[in-house]
Design a protein with these regions (language model features):
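Asp-based, Mg2+/Mn2+-dependent phosphohydrolase catalytic module
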Residues: 2-32, 38-177
Length: 177
């Protein structure tokens, strides 16, 4: 029952993902959430994120931002790098994930979804038949508002951590200098 909310992998952050390993496993594209996955909610991109997307592009990995944000927010976020995107996506509906796969021009088994929320990013990926990586939520900790969903996520993550499906990806450090 809870497994529809479980990611295939769980890591600290987007910089802990071994992208070379993903490529060696046959993945050709990544679908990223923005807020609280790549940067705190509403924040502009950082040099580290810009460098990550440049590295992924240099590796030949296709990328797409899948966000429930509007176009202006996404355009502002990605002003320093090129990537495809879908705005006002309607996550967790599987249709937006299918559209993303089409835009990336890859097969569903060649895509990995990266996000911070079980109830949108991971649920949507699972419903669309895509694999996923859950990253820990990035937030402004002093202003952090913990809603019911975040508290439910903690409970589900406890069950995930005690399930046979629980996997952590081997990590690498992306040089941020």
């Amino acid at each position: 029952m809870c497994s529809i909310f479980y990611p295939n992998y769980y890591v600290e952050d987007v910089f802990s993902i071994d992208y070379e390993k993903l490529m060696s496993m046959g993945y050709k594209a990544l679908i990223f959430d923005i807020d609280n996955t790549l940067v705190p909610h509403g924040a502009d991109s950082t040099n580290a994120v810009d460098e990550l997307f440049a590295k992924l592009n240099d590796m030949g990995m296709k990328t797409l931002l899948l966000s429930n944000n509007n176009q202006a927010r996404i355009e502002r976020f990605k002003k320093s790098f090129h990537t495809l995107y879908i705005e006002e996506a309607g996550k967790p509906h599987p249709q937006c994930y299918h559209m993303a796969v089409e835009m990336l021009e890859v097969k569903p088994n060649e895509v990995m979804v990266v996000g911070d929320q079980l109830f949108t990013d991971i649920l949507g990926a699972n419903r669309a038949g895509l694999e996923s990586i859950l990253v820990k939520y990035i937030g402004y900790y002093k202003k952090e508002k913990k809603g019911i969903r975040r508290n439910l996520e903690k409970v589900l993550l406890w069950f995930y951590g005690h399930s046979s499906r629980s996997k952590r990806m081997p990590s690498i450090t992306i040089d941020n200098s």
